[in-house]
């Protein structure tokens, strides 16, 4: 009995020591940081750290954000420096003042991409482009040379803002630019693919979505997607692998009038339902 008691005492002491050690390690790894311009600082935002109150934690108060001490340290989170990381393979968003990135293939959280890709290091992003009116234009020319779509196509199925004010309050930059539908309070990319909602915080969208024309979060700049992809060869004819990791319609000209298919057909004469669940002019198929 005495032997068993001694063993229990040893186990309890050992367990307590380990718990205290783990707690101490945990406290050492967690420190208080302040977010500033997408970066991180150990000083409050009103201190001399090249930051003002308006850029701290997305509010005017400079609230502190608790992050792991290595969260924004690429040397600890990555096998090599940020220059060797392809941010196109990751999709991220700002959550509570910190940038969190996920692998678009496995949807796994990546500390390395979260460290390196927060400052728009993605050179392949044909979606979020800020034009003169503050409109996110995926068809503009200011997207790093990638201009597959040219100027914004016209959505033939969405009413004008003067006749559809209830919908357009969610589309502050014009419903004519969104090639999707609005049904029962929800936006659909193309006709049937649910959107990721309305873009927030200057173009922020859920993982796997990007802010497209009309200020809506979609997997593709126009129409609906056709499966996941990493390489162009993963997509079928008429689609290309886009930065969100989805196959998206590629055969779109800048002057094309597009609209979503309805039950596999087009409501307007002279159009045929095609790639991306979009209505194309019949001339496309001649």
UniProtKB/Swiss-Prot annotation:
InterPro entries in the record: Cys_repeat_1
SMART domains the UniProt entry points to: WR1
Name used for this protein in its record: Uncharacterized protein C35A5.10
Source organism of the structure: Caenorhabditis elegans
């Amino acid at each position: 009995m005495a032997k068993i008691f001694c063993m229990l005492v040893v186990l309890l002491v050992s367990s307590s020591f380990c718990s205290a050690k783990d707690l101490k390690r945990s406290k050492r790894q967690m420190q208080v940081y302040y977010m500033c311009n997408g970066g991180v600082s150990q000083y409050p935002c009103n201190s001399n750290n090249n930051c003002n109150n308006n850029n701290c934690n997305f509010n005017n108060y400079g609230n502190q954000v608790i992050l792991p001490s290595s969260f924004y340290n690429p040397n600890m989170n990555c096998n090599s420096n940020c220059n060797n990381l392809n941010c196109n393979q990751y999709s991220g968003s700002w959550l509570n003042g910190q940038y969190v990135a996920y692998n678009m293939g496995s949807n796994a959280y990546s500390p390395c991409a979260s460290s390196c890709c927060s400052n728009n290091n993605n050179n392949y992003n044909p979606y979020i482009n800020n034009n003169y009116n503050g409109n996110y234009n995926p068809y503009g020319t200011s997207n790093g040379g990638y201009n597959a779509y040219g100027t914004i196509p016209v959505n033939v199925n969405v009413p004008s803002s003067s006749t559809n004010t209830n919908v357009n309050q969610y589309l502050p930059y014009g419903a004519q630019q969104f090639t999707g539908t609005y049904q029962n309070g929800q936006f659909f990319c193309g006709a049937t693919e649910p959107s990721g909602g309305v873009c927030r915080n200057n173009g922020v969208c859920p993982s796997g979505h990007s802010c497209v024309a009309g200020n809506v979060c979609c997997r593709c700049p126009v129409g609906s997607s056709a499966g996941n992809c990493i390489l162009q060869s993963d997509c079928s004819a008429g689609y290309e692998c886009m930065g969100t990791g989805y196959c998206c319609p590629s055969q779109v000209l800048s002057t094309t009038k597009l609209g979503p298919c309805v039950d596999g057909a087009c409501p307007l004469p002279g159009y045929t339902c095609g790639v991306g669940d979009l209505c194309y002019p019949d001339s496309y198929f001649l």
